[in-house]
Design a protein with these regions (language model features):
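C-terminal lobe and adjacent flexible extensions of AdoMet/dcAdoMet transferase-like proteins
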Residues: 191-194
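Short, charged/polar, Gly/Pro-enriched secondary-structure boundary elements
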Residues: 154-159
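Conserved GNAT acetyl-CoA-binding A-motif
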Residues: 99-118
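Short amphipathic alpha-helix that is part of the acyltransferase structural core
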Residues: 1-33, 49, 161-169, 173, ...
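Conserved catalytic-core motifs of GNAT/GCN5-like acyltransferases
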Residues: 108, 124, 128-147
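A conserved beta-strand-loop-helix scaffold within acyl/acetyltransferase catalytic domains
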Residues: 23-77
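Conserved acetyl-CoA-binding loop-helix of GNAT-fold acetyltransferases
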Residues: 78, 84-98
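Conserved N-terminal glycine/acidic-rich loop preference
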Residues: 67, 112-132
Length: 194
């Protein structure tokens, strides 16, 4: 049986490399900013643990403080030796359960020109299995195109009019203005007249 537990700075030091292996360096948060976020409570580092063996099988980094009541699933990584065994699916179920009292869960899927073409499509299908829907956005992370998907829980998936504020609010809690300008570029979605 799997469970989820909140981790701290020691685990971040040990497992930050796992995120670096799974995510493009251009979308990585500086480790110091993540330490700051863990300290001020604006993020949680979560471990998915096998109760029987007490082994950590997956990690997630989630921005939890927001004026709007949503959380941001920033990273989810499964340990390399236990991939393709349903751990990602179980991890998502546990994350959904942990944040069931929130308005919803937001996920960002980035794409850079040199990425494998089907990579983001595969991640979209994976998230859609858990009720995530695509939100229209004008968003880039580290210069790469970012697709936003939202799992509505108590709130709405219709965040397009304020999505640029929601995303900026998450990052402003642990990134300096300089780091935000370098990493996050999100603008209000312009509606075309029909």
């Amino acid at each position: 049986m799997l469970s989820i537990r909140k981790c701290g700075h020691k685990e971040l030091e040990r497992y930050y490399q796992l995120f670096e292996m799974d995510f493009d360096s251009r979308e990585m948060l500086p480790k110091l900013a993540v330490h700051k976020a863990l300290t001020n409570g604006s993020m949680e580092l979560l471990a998915v643990v096998d109760e029987e063996s007490k082994m950590d099988l997956a990690f997630a980094l989630v921005a939890t403080k927001s004026l709007y009541g949503y959380v941001l699933l920033k990273y989810l990584s499964v340990m390399p030796w236990c991939r393709e065994q349903g751990i990602g699916i179980e991890s998502m179920r546990l994350i959904n359960k942990r944040y069931a009292d929130r308005q919803g869960i937001i996920a960002e899927l980035t794409e850079y020109p040199e990425d494998e073409p089907q990579r983001r499509r595969k991640l979209q299908r994976f998230l859609a299995r858990f009720g995530y829907v695509e939100a229209e956005s004008d968003y880039r992370i580290g210069g790469g195109d970012a697709l936003v998907m939202i799992k509505p829980i108590r709130g709405s998936a219709e965040l397009e009019p304020v999505l640029h504020r929601v995303i900026a609010d998450f990052y402003s809690r642990f990134l300096s203005p300089f780091a935000m300008n370098r990493l996050v570029d999100i603008r209000p979605v312009k509606k075309t007249a029909e």
